[in-house]
Amino acid sequence: VVSERLAALGIEHQTGVGKTGIVAVVRGQTTNSGRSVGLRADMDALPMQEDNTFAHRSRYDGRMHGCGHDGHTTMLLAAARYLALTRAFDGTVTLIFQPGEEGYAGGKAMIEDGLFERFPADQVYALHNWPGLPVGKIAVRPGPMMAAADRITIDIEGKGGHGAHPHQAVDPVLVAGHIITAAQSIVARNVSPIDTAVVSLCAMHAGHPGAMSV
């Protein structure tokens, strides 16, 4: 879709950068300065089912834009259209449509594929939608704005048994509950209150819904 939109606007672009990334180039009315600025948006969706009934809901089962990357892509396409129609600047604007932002190292793949050797940029700008901000407002700050994240997976092995005889089992659900609660003290008691950190355990899989008493 992105490639089709860029082609319709007559914007030169390269597909397959970092496997599924797209890079477009818009040149200003003049390029005497030799300056080049990159604008980047992420494109990937999340592997989850969208249960909304909006007209703009995902058309693909098991995949949805739960983090607003469709909005980011739309904004970058709008910027591409405006820049291509006006070209009221000196230099070059590189439009970077990045895949695999949600934990799949799409940005790294593009860089390793020679992104900045093929499309040099003096600076690169990006943004993230923030529903809590009023329409028409943007928020900036010096220093880091968005945090990097690590993923953890904890496997708990218990001992099966019947819910009526908990003393004969080792209940992994109870253990998981204690871990989830205790994890919240990691930040509260190990990170300075003037620093920023978040620990979130966002999913738990335990037991079987078809066997409620086991």
Residue ranges and their predicted role:
Residues V1-H65, T74-L77, R81-F89:
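Acidic/His- and Gly-rich active-site-bordering loop/insert found
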Residues I22-V23, L46-M48, N52-M64, D70-G71, ...:
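Histidine/acidic-residue-rich, glycine-tolerant segments that coordinate divalent metal ions
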